[in-house]
């Protein structure tokens, strides 16, 4: 979303983003004001992962709507269009605000697996098992809609009622509309036609990053062969110490140096040997061109950045669309999908062994040339043309 907001501003549009406070620094880089909404995403994720009894999806939904919808309502004042992405509940609140104010509404998904299609099944919903004898994708998507209603219907409709709006009986389709955008690269995440509604695939919304790498990191890169970069990004990772040990041992087993991204798991090095370096948030667009491989959680942004850099990747998916991205990486032959969310030294070393083969490296290099970098600008132009028309 930050890349899209920056592209809109570069084209002369007045833009404001209503989002959790975690995004303030990113938005400052593109000169777009943040209207804070809700609690920190990092803190919310930490609480969910740390809790012995995680809150129910319905309780989380109610909390997200309560924390964000009023802020969205204020931020939308005077706007011509409201673009929503991300969590269903946050988008549902935004949709209700746009409906109440009579503002044009657009929804963008970051992966095809969030949009109903006859060509693949939906992501599974926690606590909503699918009958084993059901294999028709359209039926599975109908069951998915029912599950979404069961989880999110009450809090979404309660908020709508507070605005004097009627209830909706299909939260998922209400949020995504019949003309959503797909903010994902067509090579990595193609939208398959024919489908039941009109999807506009804009390409991934990449935020250009021109920041130099820190001096210590530059020195480490220059001191030896390209390392393997490992980070789980925004995933807290239970048993982080054991995960860090498994990661370092797995990379060393492949005869490679280790670049450990601390991420929200706060991973730390297991010893003081000079073949390892821990780094925080850095310019991944520059870094990934200089590593032997990338091990990550499978977020849409990290997967796209890695593919665009031409680095082979190992995806260790944790939740949601990360499973989709892991499968796409494996299907394209640009890396491997780790089996399960918790890597061991042995399992990760085996996955890296495949990712580092000459065949996978060559395939990753070839696919890199097909990844578009103009998705955010394309989407911004499309939106401004629609508003002007």
Regions found by a protein language model. Give the residues of each.
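Generic beta-sheet signal
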Residues: 18-20, 37, 106-109, 202, ...
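Short gly/pro/ser/thr-enriched loop/turn and capping motifs at secondary-structure boundaries
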Residues: 24-25, 41-44, 107, 111-118, ...
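Nucleotide-activated sugar donor-binding and catalytic core shared by glycosyltransferases
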Residues: 1-16, 22, 26-29, 56, ...
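Structural motif
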Residues: 80-81, 179, 227, 293
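Conserved nucleotide-sugar phosphate-binding/catalytic loop shared by glycosyltransferases and other
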Residues: 16-57, 133-136
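Donor-nucleotide binding loops and adjacent catalytic segments primarily
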Residues: 5, 184-293
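Conserved nucleotide-sugar donor-interacting segment of glycosyltransferase catalytic cores
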Residues: 66-138, 187-189
């Amino acid at each position: 979303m930050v890349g899209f907001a920056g592209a809109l501003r570069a084209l002369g549009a007045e833009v404001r983003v209503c989002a959790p406070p975690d995004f303030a620094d990113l938005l400052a880089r593109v000169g777009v004001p943040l209207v804070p909404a809700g609690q920190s995403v990092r803190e919310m994720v930490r609480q969910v992962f740390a809790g012995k009894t995680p809150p129910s999806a319905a309780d989380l939904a109610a909390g997200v709507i309560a924390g964000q919808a009023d802020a969205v309502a204020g931020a939308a004042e005077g706007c011509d269009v409201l673009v929503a992405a991300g969590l269903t509940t946050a988008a549902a609140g935004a949709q209700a605000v746009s409906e109440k104010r009579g503002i044009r509404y657009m929804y963008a998904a970051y992966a095809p697996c969030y949009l109903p299609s006859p060509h693949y099944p939906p992501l599974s919903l926690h606590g909503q098992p699918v009958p084993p004898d059901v294999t028709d994708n359209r039926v599975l998507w109908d069951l998915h809609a029912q599950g979404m209603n069961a989880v999110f219907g009450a809090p979404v409709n309660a908020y709508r009622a507070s605005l004097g709006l009627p209830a909706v009986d299909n939260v998922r389709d209400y949020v995504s509309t019949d003309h959503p955008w797909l903010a994902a690269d067509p090579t990595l995440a193609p939208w398959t036609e024919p489908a039941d509604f009109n999807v506009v695939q804009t390409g991934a919304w990449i935020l250009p990053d021109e920041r130099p790498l820190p001096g210590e990191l530059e020195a480490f890169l220059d001191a030896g062969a390209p390392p393997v970069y490992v980070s789980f990004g925004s995933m807290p990772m239970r048993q982080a110490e054991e995960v860090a040990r498994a990661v370092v041992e797995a990379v060393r087993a492949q005869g490679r140096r280790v670049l450990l991204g601390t991420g929200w798991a706060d991973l730390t090095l297991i010893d003081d040997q000079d073949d390892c370096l821990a780094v925080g948030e850095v310019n991944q667009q520059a870094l990934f061109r200089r590593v032997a491989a990338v091990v990550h959680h499978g977020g849409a942004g990290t997967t796209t950045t890695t593919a665009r850099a031409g680095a082979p990747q190992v995806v260790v998916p944790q939740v949601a669309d990360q499973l989709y991205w892991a499968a796409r990486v494996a299907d394209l032959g640009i890396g491997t999908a780790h089996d399960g969310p918790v890597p061991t030294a042995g399992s990760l070393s085996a996955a890296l062994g495949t990712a580092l083969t000459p065949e996978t490296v060559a395939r990753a290099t070839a696919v890199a040339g097909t990844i578009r970098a103009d998705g955010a600008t394309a989407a911004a132009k499309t939106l401004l043309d629609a508003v002007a028309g």
